[in-house]
Each structure stands twice: as C-alpha cells, then as structure tokens.
C-alpha cells in the first residue's frame, strides 16, 4: 500500500514554521466543520487543513468552540488529573480509547484535543492554564508526525509520541502499529509518566 512518500512526517512541522499560518488538524466531523469555518472566515492568516483518509468516529465532547481556541479538554478527568494526553487529528480518538483503558487501571487522565497549536498559543494565559495547568507536568503528546514543536506542550517531564524516521511500506494499519500508535502503547507511556 502506501510507502514513505505517503507518510510525510515532516509536513506538519514545515507548515507550522510558516509565519502566521494556521495548521488545523481536526479529529472528527465536528472539529472539521469548525476548522472549515475558521479557514473561510480567516482574513489575516492562511490556513492549512490537514485531514485523514481514515474513517473516524464523531467523539463525545467534540467542540466547535474548543477548536476556535486551538485546543480544549475533550475528555475531562473523573476526579484528579494524574496526567494529560494531548493529541491532534485521528490520534484524538486513540487518546480517548487509551483514557478508557487507563481508568480501568486506576489512572485518571485528561485528554486535550489540540487541532491548532498556533491558535492555542494566541489564547490568554488563563485559558491556556485551564487546559494545560502548570501543576500537571505528566504529559504525553500523540501525533503521527515529527516531534518538532511538541516539547513546549509536554515539558521536560513529558513524553512525545511521534515519528522521527522515514516511513515504511506496508498496509496502513501495520505501519501505524509498527510505529507504536496503539492504545496499548499510549497506556504504557502514561504508566511510565505516573510511576
């Protein structure tokens, strides 16, 4: 199936490095509608919509308003926030599935959908703190692309799940699994953080 030329891991980082560019990676149909609205209403910023070819479910908690702020809590912790998983695009669903498994193990996480880093960075400090509070330093980012740019959100104590090597030739599901983008691997990484 798809080989390395269809796995452009550097493209998100390259697009995000363009001044004033908004790179939006929606995770489902609700986020896509919000992203489209932002793109057509934008008069100052060029916008790149990064979409998946995968079938993705509409997620409970998806928010048009959240997308307009660049990032938002799509999966709130039950009681206390042991860790935060930050994801974009189709990986948000992966993060939500991992949240369910982690809760079974007694680990209570928050899931943040971050479709647009640039818009989130423009929010006021209070909003950013409400989504990514400073006192929760156990953070994991999940994006099937270069790690470039994610360290500022996870900090020195966090883990970045990314792809920092050339792609592979195989059916999509095999490639995804070989790079570790599975519920089990997300759970394992969160467990490393909270120990």
Regions found by a protein language model. Give the residues of each.
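Short, basic, glycine/proline-bearing loop/turn elements
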Residues: 21-23, 114-115
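Thiamine diphosphate
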Residues: 1-8, 41-195
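Short beta->alpha connector loops at strand-helix junctions that form conserved
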Residues: 25-28, 164
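Internal gly/pro-rich beta-alpha loop/helix module
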Residues: 1-18, 29-30, 34-40
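Short catalytic-loop micro-motif centered on adjacent basic/acidic residues
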Residues: 22-25, 86
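Mobile "lid/hinge" segments at catalytic clefts and subdomain interfaces of large enzymes
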Residues: 19-22, 146
């Amino acid at each position: 199936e798809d080989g390395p030329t269809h796995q452009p891991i550097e493209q998100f980082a390259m697009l995000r490095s363009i001044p004033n560019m908004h790179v939006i990676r929606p995770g489902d149909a609700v986020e896509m509608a919000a992203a489209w609205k932002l793109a057509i209403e934008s008069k100052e910023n060029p916008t790149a919509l990064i979409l998946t070819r995968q079938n993705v479910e509409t997620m409970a908690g998806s928010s048009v308003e959240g997308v307009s702020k660049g990032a938002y809590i799509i999966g709130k912790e039950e009681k206390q926030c042991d860790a935060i998983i930050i994801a974009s695009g189709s990986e948000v669903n992966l993060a939500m599935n991992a949240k369910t498994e982690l809760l079974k193990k007694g680990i209570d996480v928050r899931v943040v959908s971050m479709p647009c880093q640039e818009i989130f960075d423009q929010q006021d400090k209070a909003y950013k703190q409400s989504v990514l509070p400073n006192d929760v330093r156990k953070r994991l980012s999940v994006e099937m692309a270069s790690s470039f740019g994610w360290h500022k959100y996870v900090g020195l104590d966090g883990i970045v799940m990314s792809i920092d090597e050339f792609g592979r030739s195989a059916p999509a599901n095999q490639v995804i699994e070989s790079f570790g983008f599975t519920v089990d691997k997300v759970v394992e990484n969160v467990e490393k953080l909270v120990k």
